């Protein structure tokens, strides 16, 4: 009788452990994206979320046993949306910064970016003209470059004027319309804009390069572990190379 009960108990424990290890398998997660951040995240012509990060997350979700839904959110409040559980993660070109690390956890980095100034293609403005010549410079609010430029201007006595936008593409449109002289943004979306619009990349402006990572809530340790493992597998796969080539990332 004892042996029989022991076998039953061991069987029950095995089932419980198996269930626990698969507790997250098949779980639906909501990924918050900046829908105006090509080539990493955007809404395509069919009205469907697309981009490098969207396709990467689709692959990782399938690989790690998740179902993922991508939802556009205002970038300036996307960390708040994560903390209040409106979304489960942010895989959408988010820089890993000390300020953000105080609130959320990040995966291992998957892409390194630098910040640049974008101007009209026929512009003769120099970087000094933009930083010291009372020029209007556009920047997406809630970004690390917006914070850096504001602090650097105060520290260095630059007299540029900052105008804040909901997205980098809106700032690019105002460059073309003559409302602002330039816009500061990450180099990948800047290249995307230069390929499609009558603008060019003027160059970097002194801000150090940053790493992109996926953000999750600090308490979601299993999700963080799974995303790190998924990224590791993805970056070792041929599909990673295909995505990099498809979205012309360098």
State the predicted function of each range.
Residues 25-93:
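Extracytoplasmic small-molecule ligand-binding "clamshell" domains
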Residues 77-80, 93-102, 148-151, 174-177, ...:
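A ligand-binding cleft/hinge motif common to bilobed small-molecule-binding domains
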Residues 62, 67-131, 200-207:
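Acidic, polar ligand-binding/catalytic clefts
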Residues 35, 112-119, 191, 195-232, ...:
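Periplasmic-binding protein-like
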Residues 66-67, 83-92, 134-136, 167, ...:
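Alpha-to-beta junction loops
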Residues 43, 57-65, 145-164, 194-195, ...:
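Ligand-binding cleft/hinge of the Venus flytrap
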Residues 54, 69-80, 124-125, 162-177:
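Short helix-initiation/N-cap motifs at beta->coil->alpha
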């Amino acid at each position: 009788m004892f042996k029989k009960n022991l076998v039953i108990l061991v069987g029950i424990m095995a089932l419980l452990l198996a269930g626990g290890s698969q507790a997250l398998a098949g779980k639906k997660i909501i990924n918050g994206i900046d829908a105006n951040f090509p080539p990493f995240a955007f809404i395509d012509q069919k009205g469907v979320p697309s981009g490098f990060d969207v396709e990467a997350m689709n692959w990782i979700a399938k690989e790690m046993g998740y179902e993922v839904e991508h939802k556009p959110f205002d970038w300036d409040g996307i960390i708040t949306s994560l903390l209040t559980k409106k979304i489960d993660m942010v895989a959408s070109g988010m820089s890993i910064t000390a300020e953000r690390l105080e609130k959320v956890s990040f995966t291992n980095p998957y892409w390194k970016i630098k910040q640049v100034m974008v101007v009209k293609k026929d512009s003769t403005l120099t970087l000094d003209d933009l930083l010291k010549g009372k020029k209007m410079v556009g920047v997406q609010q809630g970004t690390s470059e917006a914070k850096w430029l504001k602090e650097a201007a105060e520290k260095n006595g630059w007299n540029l004027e900052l105008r804040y936008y909901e997205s980098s593409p809106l700032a690019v449109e105002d460059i073309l319309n003559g409302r602002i002289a330039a816009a500061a943004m990450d180099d990948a979306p800047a290249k995307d804009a230069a390929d499609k619009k009558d603008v060019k990349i003027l160059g970097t402006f002194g801000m150090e390069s940053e790493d992109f990572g996926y953000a999750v809530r600090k308490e979601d340790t299993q999700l963080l572990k799974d995303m790190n493992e998924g990224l590791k597998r993805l970056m070792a796969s041929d599909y990673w190379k295909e995505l990099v080539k498809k979205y012309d990332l360098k």
